[in-house]
């Protein structure tokens, strides 16, 4: 799903499998869409990942250059 979503302008989708990857996707890549594997992620963990994704903000700074390059594609 993330691959398909990333074909849409302005979308920065990330497939996350734990809270750490969700946090880093937001902090470093300014991900704005979260995808989860239904067959490999239990309901309890999925809720924790979603919460972490929603409460985490983009760090900006040195990471902004990468996001700008992605947006320019």
Language-model region placement:
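Short glycine/serine/threonine-rich phosphate/pyrophosphate-binding segments
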Residues: 1-4
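C-terminal binding/interaction regions
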Residues: 8, 13, 19-73
């Amino acid at each position: 799903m993330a691959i398909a979503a990333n074909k849409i302008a302005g979308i920065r989708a990330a497939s996350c499998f734990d809270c750490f990857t969700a946090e880093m996707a937001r902090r470093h890549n300014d991900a704005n869409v979260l995808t989860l594997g239904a067959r490999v992620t239990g309901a309890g963990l999925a809720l924790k990942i979603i919460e972490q994704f929603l409460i985490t903000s983009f760090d900006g700074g040195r990471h902004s250059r990468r996001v700008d390059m992605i947006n320019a594609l």
